[in-house]
């Protein structure tokens, strides 16, 4: 998959010339398998889980194809920033508390290819009917343990119940 032209182009845009061992392993596995990545902060996990997504997205579908749940707005914004740096051209939305709900709702009227959000804000959008997760093919739970530690268990259950089976 590292020879995939989409991934090569994305890497060229970041200035990264070589992937680390974990990133190579994730790229090799692709998105067809469930994975758990355990690695210290700053080790490149975000890039490792974003790169394989690029080869699964299609421009024909104007629906949410992947969902990333992060426990904090800071992490959600970091993931969004890394995704945008890949220069894929796919639409991405980031939803989190403290950001105007009206702005997020308006943006969600034209669904992104990738939706990133915090558990509480995603549940708000689900309950208000602002987001449809039925087309999500890939789910990434970044720092899932932290989400549970912060008490987002019920929110995670709500979100997961709205994903396709």
Can you describe what each PLM-predicted range is?
Residues 119-165:
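SF2 helicase catalytic motif II
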Residues 1-38, 142:
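Conserved pre-motif I regulatory segment
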Residues 52, 107, 155-158:
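Alpha-helical transmission elements in cytosolic ATPase-linked domains
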Residues 24-35, 46-61, 74-77, 82-86, ...:
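Walker A/P-loop NTP-binding motif
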Residues 23, 41-45, 119, 142-145:
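Conserved phosphate-binding and hydrolysis motifs of nucleotide-dependent enzymes
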Residues 38-41, 71:
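P-loop (Walker A) phosphate-binding loop of NTP-binding proteins
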Residues 4-9, 61-127, 135-138:
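Conserved nucleic-acid-binding Ia/Ib motif block in the N-terminal RecA-like helicase ATPase lobe
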Residues 13-17, 91-95, 147-149:
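Short, flexible loop segments at the rims of nucleotide/cofactor-binding pockets, characterized by
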